[in-house]
Amino acid sequence: MQRPENDIKGIAPRKLLIKRSGEKKMICKIRKWKLSDATDLAAALSNKKIQDNLRDGLPYPYTEQDGTEYISAMLSADENETFAFAITVDNKVIGSIGVFRQENIHRQTAELGYYIAEEYWGKGIMTEAVKQICEYVFAGSDIIRIYAEPFAYNTASCRVLEKAGFQYEGTLRSNAVKNGKVIDMKMYSLLK
């Protein structure tokens, strides 16, 4: 079976059993962004609950034009420094995931960031996407450590990382200011 040209080579899409009123198999995969994804991206990010778990700087509401600008930036980024992909379920874009190489003495370390649309929370999809991107980055680059720093109150994100094999390294006390509050963050990492 031939892969569509935007699929990530070497990463097999996996079927997840999603439990709703009935059981439905959904295919979760990461793929390169397309400019036509801007509408789905804007729909996912125009949600305050999602933005409350991300770093500051995103416009709210998030527009299709904002999505187009972000996707353009990701498509033009150095592919050895920025690994940024759309998360899809059954060919619909439902979120974003990226691994971003650090600099200087941390040049073989990269930070992981991600989110998915609220209606897909708690279904194992994000854990699967995290596994896929880590597999891809470790197989195709010299990166030896991928880390993530979720807000300490974001227990769902912490669970995603743990289920994806990341190890909890500690709490970064009073490490950020979000929505006017000083908050802790947690440090997780996965080694090659």
Regions of interest found by a model, annotated:
Residues M1-T39, A43-K49, A84-K192:
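Acyl-donor (CoA/ACP) binding surface of acyl/acetyltransferases
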Residues L45, L54, L75-D78:
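Hydrophobic residues in alpha-helical segments
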Residues S72-A86:
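A short helix-loop-beta-strand connector motif used in the catalytic cores of GNAT acetyltransferases and
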Residues Q51-A73:
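Conserved GNAT-fold acetyl-CoA-binding loop/helix
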